[in-house]
Amino acid sequence: METVEGIMVVTTETIPGYRIVEVKGIARGGIVKATHIGRDIMAVLRNIKGGEVREYTQMMAEAREEALRRMALHAKELGANAVVNVRFATSNVGSSVAEVYAYGTAVVVEKEE
C-alpha cells in the first residue's frame, strides 16, 4: 500500500486490515504537462533511431506522480484518509503536451480489530 500526502492510495476496492466506514466521493487530480524544447529535439532524434523515448517516459512518470499527489490532496479536502480503486487516464492535448488524470473513491477507513 502506498501513502501519498498522508492518504492511503490503492488500486483495489478494499485495503487489507481496514474497513471502509464512510464514502466521501470521487477524488481527482490532473495535470497537463508539456515537454521542454530540448527534450523534444532529443525525442525526435531517438524516434529516428528507434527505441524508447526516455524524455517522454520521464515526463509521463513525473505527470503521473503529480496527478496522484493532487488526487490525494483533493481526498484530504473531502475529509478522507484513503482512496480506493485508483485509476489513471491520459490524453494528448497537443503536440508534446499530455494530460494525466488520477481518480478514485475517497473513503474513511478504520483499522479492523
UniProtKB/Swiss-Prot annotation:
SUPFAM superfamilies reported in the protein's UniProt record: YbjQ-like
A Pfam short name: YbjQ_1
InterPro entries named among the record's database cross-references: UPF0145_dom_sf, UPF0145_YbjQ-like
Domain of life: Archaea
Recorded family membership: Belongs to the UPF0145 family.
Protein name: UPF0145 protein TK1926
Source organism per UniProt: Thermococcus kodakarensis (strain ATCC BAA-918 / JCM 12380 / KOD1) (Pyrococcus kodakaraensis (strain KOD1))
Lineage summary: Archaea, Methanobacteriati, Methanobacteriota, Thermococci, Thermococcales
